[in-house]
C-alpha cells in the first residue's frame, strides 16, 4: 500500500515539474526567441551532418549563416520593448543586453564566411567547427542577459569550453596544442576565482543570487560596506579580467592568438570581449553599487596597465597575430574607460560605439591576415614587404583597418576614440584620457611602420613570399567579410550621430 502511495506522489511531483517547465517555455520562451533560433540551427546542423555526405557541406555554411541572420532579425524586431525578467529571475531582456547580443551575433556572422576557405584549405572538420562557433555564440548571448550568479557562471563556461576546443582545432600543430593547454589551465583557474568571489557576495547578502536582490540583501544585512565586499570585488575582478584580458591578466592572449587557427583568433578576439564587457558592466554597476569608488580605482589601474603595456610591447612583435594580440590588450584599456564613466556621462554609449567600430576594424585586419596566410603560408610582419606591388586591394584594405585601429581621421576608429575620450574627460578622468591619447600615438607608430612596409617595399626588400604571391579569383568569402569590415571601418565615421543615438538608448 505504501509503495502505491509513494508511486502516486512521485507521479504527481513529476507532473508538477513538467508543467512548470512547460509553463516557463511557453510564456518565457518568447523572450529568448533569438537564442532558440540558434539552438534550432545547431540541431539542424547535427541532423544534416549525420544523414548526408561531403557534397552537402555548402548547406552547413548556409544553415549556420541563416540561423545567425534570423537571430539578428528577431533581436531587431524586439528592440525598444519593455525590460523583462524571465525564467524565475535567471535572465533579463532589455535594450542594453540586446545591443551586446547584436554585436556578438554580428561577429559570428562575419567570422563564418571568413573561415570557409581556410577550413577547406586546411581540411579541418567543418561541422564541429560550426557547432563550436554557434554554441559559443549562444553562450555569449546568454551571458549578456544573465541576471543571477548561476547563469553568469554557466554561460561563460559554455563559451569558454567551445573556445578551448576551437583554439586547439588544428590538433597536429604543436603551437595550437600549447596554446590550448595554457588557455584551458588559466581559464579553469579564473573560473574558480570568479566563483569564490560570488560565494562571498552570496554569504554577505544573506543567500541571494539575483543581481538586484543581492543589493537589497546587502542593505538588509548592513554588509554593503564590510571588508568582505572588497574581498569579493578583488576576486570577481580577477575572474572577469581573464575574459577581458587586460594587463596583468593578459599572459594567455599572445600565445593563444599565435597558436590558434587565424579565423578562430578573429572570432575570439571580439566575441569574448563583447560578452565579458556586458557582464562586467552589470556586475560592477549593480551588486557593487555601494563600492563604486573601489571598483573605479581597480579598473583605472587595469586600464592604465593595459594601454601602456599592450601598446609598448606591440612595437617589438614580429608576428602579425601577436602584434594584434598586444594591440587588443591596449584596446580593452580604452573600453574600460567607458565602463568606469558609466551611464551618467554617456560612458556606456561611448563604450558600445567604440566596440562596434572595433569589431569591424579588428575582423577586417584578421580577414587580411587570413587571406595573406593562405596565399603565402607566413605570418611574419617582414614578409608583408612590398605587398602593394602584388595585391593593391589587400594591401589597401589592411592599411585602412590598421589606420582605423590607430585612430587616424576621418576613419571610424578616430571618431570612436574621440567620443570615448570626450566622455572620459567630461567625467573627470583626465589622467586616463591623457594616457589613452599618449598610447594611441604609440599605436599609430607601429601601425604606420607596417603600412610603410606594405607600400614601399623595394625590389631587393621584397621577400620570396610576396615575390611568388599569386592572387586567387576574387569570389571567395574571405574577401566578402573583408570588404564589409573595411567599409564599416571607414564610412561610419562620417555619420556618427545615428550610431550614438542608438547607443544612448541602451539603458538598464
Curated annotation (Swiss-Prot):
It is an enzyme of class 7 (translocase). Keywords: Chloroplast, Membrane, NAD, NADP, Plastid, Plastoquinone, Quinone, Thylakoid, Translocase, Transmembrane, Transmembrane helix, Transport. GO terms for biological process: ATP synthesis coupled electron transport; photosynthesis, light reaction. The keyword Transport applies. It is a multi-pass membrane protein. Signal peptide: none annotated. GO terms for molecular function: NADH dehydrogenase (ubiquinone) activity; quinone binding. It holds the Pfam family Proton_antipo_M. The chain crosses the membrane at residues 24-44, 59-79, 99-119, 124-144, 149-169, 184-204, 227-247, 295-315, 323-343, 354-374, 395-415, 418-438, 482-502. Its EC number is 7.1.1.-. GO terms for cellular component: chloroplast thylakoid membrane. InterPro entries: NADH-Q_OxRdtase_suN/2, ND/Mrp_TM, Ndh2_N. NDH shuttles electrons from NAD(P)H:plastoquinone, via FMN and iron-sulfur (Fe-S) centers, to quinones in the photosynthetic chain and possibly in a chloroplast respiratory chain. The immediate electron acceptor for the enzyme in this species is believed to be plastoquinone. Couples the redox reaction to proton translocation, and thus conserves the redox energy in a proton gradient. Belongs to the complex I subunit 2 family. NDH is composed of at least 16 different subunits, 5 of which are encoded in the nucleus. This is NAD(P)H-quinone oxidoreductase subunit 2 A, chloroplastic. It comes from Ipomoea purpurea.
Amino acid at each position: 500500500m505504501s509503495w502505491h502511495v509513494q508511486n502516486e506522489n512521485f507521479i504527481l511531483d513529476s507532473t508538477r515539474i513538467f508543467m512548470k517547465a512547460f509553463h516557463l517555455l511557453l510564456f518565457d520562451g518568447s523572450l529568448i526567441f533569438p537564442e532558440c533560433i540558434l539552438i534550432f540551427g545547431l540541431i539542424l546542423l547535427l541532423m544534416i551532418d549525420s544523414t548526408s555526405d561531403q557534397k552537402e557541406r555548402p548547406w552547413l555554411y548556409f544553415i549556420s549563416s541563416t540561423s545567425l541572420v534570423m537571430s539578428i532579425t528577431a533581436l531587431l524586431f524586439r528592440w525598444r520593448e519593455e525590460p523583462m525578467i524571465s525564467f524565475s529571475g535567471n535572465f533579463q531582456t532589455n535594450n542594453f543586453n540586446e545591443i551586446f547580443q547584436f554585436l556578438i551575433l554580428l561577429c559570428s556572422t562575419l567570422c563564418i564566411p571568413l573561415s570557409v576557405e581556410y577550413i577547406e584549405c586546411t581540411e579541418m572538420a567543418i561541422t564541429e567547427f560550426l557547432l563550436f562557433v554557434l554554441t559559443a555564440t549562444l553562450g555569449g548571448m546568454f551571458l549578456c542577459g544573465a541576471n543571477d550568479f548561476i547563469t553568469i557562471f554557466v554561460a561563460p563556461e559554455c563559451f569558454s569550453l567551445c573556445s578551448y576546443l576551437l583554439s586547439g582545432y588544428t590538433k597536429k600543430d604543436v603551437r595550437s596544442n600549447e596554446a590550448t593547454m595554457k588557455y584551458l589551465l588559466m581559464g579553469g583557474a579564473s573560473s574558480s576565482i570568479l566563483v569564490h568571489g560570488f560565494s562571498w557576495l552570496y554569504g554577505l547578502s544573506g543567500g541571494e543570487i539575483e543581481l538586484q536582490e543581492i543589493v537589497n540583501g546587502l542593505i538588509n544585512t548592513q554588509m554593503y560596506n564590510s571588508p568582505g565586499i572588497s574581498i569579493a570585488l578583488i576576486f570577481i575582478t580577477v575572474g572577469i579580467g581573464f575574459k577581458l584580458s587586460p594587463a596583468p591578466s593578459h599572459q594567455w592572449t599572445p600565445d593563444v592568438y599565435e597558436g590558434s587557427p587565424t579565423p578562430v583568433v578573429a572570432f575570439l578576439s571580439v566575441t569574448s570581449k563583447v560578452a565579458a564587457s556586458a557582464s562586467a558592466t552589470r556586475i560592477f554597476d549593480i551588486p557593487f553599487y555601494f563600492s563604486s569608488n573601489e571598483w573605479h580605482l581597480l579598473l583605472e589601474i587595469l586600464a592604465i596597465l593595459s594601454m601602456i603595456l599592450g601598446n609598448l610591447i606591440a612595437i617589438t612583435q614580429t608576428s602579425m597575430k601577436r602584434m594584434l594580440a598586444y594591440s587588443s590588450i591596449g584596446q580593452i584599456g580604452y573600453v574600460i574607460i567607458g565602463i568606469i564613466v558609466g551611464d551618467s556621462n554617456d560612458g556606456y554609449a561611448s563604450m558600445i560605439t567604440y566596440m562596434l567600430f572595433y569589431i569591424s576594424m579588428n575582423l577586417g585586419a584578421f580577414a587580411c591576415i587570413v587571406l595573406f596566410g593562405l596565399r603565402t603560408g607566413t605570418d611574419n610582419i617582414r614578409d608583408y614587404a612590398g605587398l602593394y606591388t602584388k595585391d593593391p586591394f589587400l594591401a589597401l584594405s589592411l592599411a585602412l583597418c590598421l589606420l582605423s585601429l590607430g585612430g587616424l581621421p576621418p576613419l571610424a576608429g578616430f571618431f570612436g576614440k574621440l567620443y570615448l575620450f570626450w566622455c572620459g574627460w567630461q567625467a573627470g578622468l583626465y589622467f586616463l584620457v591623457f594616457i589613452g591619447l599618449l598610447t594611441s600615438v604609440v599605436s599609430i607608430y607601429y601601425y604606420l611602420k607596417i603600412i610603410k612596409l606594405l607600400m614601399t617595399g623595394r625590389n631587393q626588400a621584397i621577400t620570396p613570399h610576396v615575390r611568388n604571391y599569386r592572387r586567387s579569383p576574387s569570389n571567395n568569402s574571405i574577401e566578402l567579410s573583408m570588404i564589409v569590415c573595411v567599409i564599416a571601418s571607414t564610412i561610419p565615421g562620417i555619420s556618427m550621430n545615428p550610431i550614438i543615438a542608438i547607443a544612448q538608448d541602451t539603458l538598464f
